[in-house]
Amino acid sequence: MTEKCIEWFWKSNDNPFSTMESAQWNRYSDIENTIIEEAFTTLKKAYVILDDYHIDFEHRVQISNDDKSKQRPVKRVEINKDEDRLREARFMPNPLVSTNWENRKREMVEKAILGILHEGKLAGKQCEAKWIIQQLEKVKDQTKKEIGECCIYLYSLESFLYKILNHTMRLIGNKNHENVWRSKIETLGPFAFLLYYYLSYENLNHRTSTIVYRGAQLTDEMIAEYQYVTRSKDSRRSFQTFTSCSRNRAKAEQFGNTLFVFKAEKRTSYRTLNMDISSLSAYPEEEEVLIRPGRSFKIERVEFEKTKKKHVIYLTLISTSETN
């Protein structure tokens, strides 16, 4: 039997109450959905207050907190949880490594909480930040495994947190934006480290060397660069971020004009493997495999599939010892 779930949407048309236009609906973020549904179903509230607006359940409208005249219809939809969809891949900045992590897990979680609270305020997403913090508070005195599993789940959600981490990742190493990404180390670093630690050392049962796939939209210049590297003496490179892939090729092919195909060369060490996080993710149907920062790979070849009109770039994941 197909499992069902509830999602809330707001009408995004320029004139949201017009009956002459085709309706356009935008989905609330994962955390907003959770807050809304809990207020509607569990708490039986007449309304729920979010960061920028509140929702009147009786009239099914979203109302601006700053201007009550700004209203939009909302709707509650029951969908199949295993719908065939795959979200855009998400990224993470390089983490800070604490040598005393074994004895400081509670302190690290508390630092992550403070950082998320700060970033939530900057983004105007205090409600989302509060919800995320509540989840971390529940596990801060638990085992490393339970803390890591919570962080994986939070990372898998559509929220301001992963978007800010994604944006920061793009700036790392960019001298023109050095002040920006360095300013995020204190606030985003602790949460990034919790993720990194779990992926590196915990839950070996989730390790996998299966072939995984990732869709991307590349320019002609970027594709040419990959082709150039395959002809160079050293085709090895490394991931600077957390990289999300899927075990499902068909789903990955939904995105962009290019498909990356990742294959692990050897099972020489658990550190060379990748983690299947589908059982921990909010979206298990995506069949997500997460590759941690620092993983090295070789660019093997670049091909063009005429039938699908896509470039396919084949990469082999290698261990640290193979990069020397």
Name these PLM-found stretches.
Residues 209, 294-296:
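Tight coil/turn sites that cap or link beta-strands
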Residues 21-24, 61, 67-69, 73-78, ...:
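Short coil/turn segments at secondary-structure boundaries
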Residues 307-324:
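Short solvent-exposed strand/turn elements
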Residues 126-278:
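Internal glycine-rich, Lys/Arg-flanked active-site/core loops of soluble domains
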Residues 1-127, 138, 193:
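Eukaryote-biased intrinsically disordered, low-complexity acidic regions enriched in Ser/Thr/Pro
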Residues 13-16, 53-55, 61, 67-69, ...:
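Conserved beta-strand elements of beta-rich interaction domains across eukaryotes
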Residues 269-293:
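Flexible, small-/acidic-enriched active-site or ligand-binding loops
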